[in-house]
């Protein structure tokens, strides 16, 4: 049988090729392509399959991407040619997707809400993170897990989990905790999409108040849209704007976390792992500003939003391929309890605020 060379191109090969002028640059580009293509293609294929299933069967796209990705975990084994590309998709592609989320938000949308909803969103996010931090520490799961889950529940679900995980210090449990958070937040968000409109009706909330409640509590954007427009068009519009305001809280939260861990690294005498404000958050703010100017045509904005969604689903698929079911089963009941408690805490806090404002 003929031997097939499966050697993965290395960074040393790339740097060596770059020394030989234009021809070397072309050769280096080819080596990079060979290095990343198998894993990126596998991740995009998982994303495409997840999108197809979601469009035809209605379940959350990210949940499908995770489950399909985990079925192909063998592609991320140490000797696999796809490993480097999968790592690229789970990090760089992820950051691109988060940065492009800024094209969903305008400053005008935030201004149109008035002061009270903005203050409510700010304190609900802050208090949910602090609650998660305290509860996680009390239950022996550590501060990082509390920040990760609290931020995910308080801000924007799976997207926030990925963005926050990107700036937290990494350890042997980081990827497992991120995947667990994404799976749990997707399940809780789906349940909230079904249950929270009924809760709004029970409390007799009008269309605007119901929109504030749904947008301020449901975890992922897609489920907010689904729940809001199932009540009324006004409720859907209000819920979407409130939700996007929560998405914008990614910027200060990620900046503060980066600042905290930057100072901690300096105190410990270690070189800082990241800049104070990661580039993908800088671009997030930049895209919010560009979108606020109204200079980007709507078809282009929609295209960018689609690219963002594809990047995030691709990254989730890659993370799934790097995660084993065994490691998830080892998490235990405490993390599940923490995330349920955070979800209930946020719902009660926002509902109380909405009733008070009404």
UniProtKB/Swiss-Prot annotation:
Family: Belongs to the UPF0324 family.
Organism: Chlorobaculum tepidum (strain ATCC 49652 / DSM 12025 / NBRC 103806 / TLS) (Chlorobium tepidum)
Range of residues in the leader sequence: none
Keyword line: Cell membrane, Membrane, Transmembrane, Transmembrane helix
Pfam families, sorted: Cons_hypoth698
Annotated PANTHER family: INNER MEMBRANE PROTEIN YEIH-RELATED, UPF0324 INNER MEMBRANE PROTEIN YEIH
Gene Ontology cellular component terms for the protein in this record: plasma membrane
Membrane topology listed for this record: Multi-pass membrane protein
Sequence intervals crossing the membrane: 36-53, 57-76, 83-105, 115-134, 146-168, 178-200, 244-261, 276-295, 307-325, 335-357
Protein name: UPF0324 membrane protein CT0845
Subcellular location: Cell membrane
């Amino acid at each position: 049988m003929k031997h097939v060379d499966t050697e993965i191109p290395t960074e040393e090969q790339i740097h060596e090729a770059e020394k030989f002028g234009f021809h070397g640059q072309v050769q280096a580009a080819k080596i990079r392509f060979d290095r990343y293509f198998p894993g990126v293609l596998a991740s995009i294929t998982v994303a495409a399959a997840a999108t197809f299933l979601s469009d035809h069967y209605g379940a959350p796209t990210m949940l499908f991407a995770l489950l399909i990705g985990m079925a192909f975990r063998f592609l991320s084994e140490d000797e696999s040619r796809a490993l480097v590309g999968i790592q690229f998709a789970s990090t760089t592609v992820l950051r691109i997707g988060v940065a492009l989320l800024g094209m969903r938000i305008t400053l005008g949308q935030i201004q149109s809400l008035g002061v009270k909803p903005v203050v409510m969103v700010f304190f609900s996010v802050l208090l949910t993170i602090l609650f998660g931090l305290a509860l996680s520490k009390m239950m022996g799961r550590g501060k990082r897990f509390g920040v990760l889950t609290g931020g995910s529940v308080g801000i924007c679900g799976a997207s926030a989990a990925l963005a926050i995980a990107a700036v937290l210090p990494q350890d042997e449990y980081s990827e497992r905790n991120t995947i667990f958070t994404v799976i749990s937040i997707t399940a809780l968000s789906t349940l909230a999409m079904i249950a929270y409109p009924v809760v709004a009706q029970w409390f007799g909330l009008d269309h605007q108040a119901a929109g504030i409640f749904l947008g301020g509590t449901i975890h992922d954007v897609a489920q907010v849209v689904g729940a809001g427009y199932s009540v009324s068009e006004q409720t859907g519009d209000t819920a979407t704007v409130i939700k996007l305001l929560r998405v914008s809280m990614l910027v200060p939260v990620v900046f503060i976390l980066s600042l905290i861990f930057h100072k901690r690294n300096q105190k410990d005498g270690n070189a800082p792992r990241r800049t104070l404000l990661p580039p993908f958050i800088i671009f997030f703010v930049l895209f919010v500003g560009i979108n606020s100017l109204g200079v980007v045509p709507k078809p282009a904005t929609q295209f960018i939003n689609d690219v963002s969604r594809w990047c995030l689903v691709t990254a989730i698929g890659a993370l799934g391929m790097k995660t084993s079911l065994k490691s998830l089963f080892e998490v235990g009941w405490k993390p599940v309890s923490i995330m349920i408690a955070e979800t209930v805490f946020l719902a009660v806090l926002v509902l109380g605020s909405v009733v008070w404002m009404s």
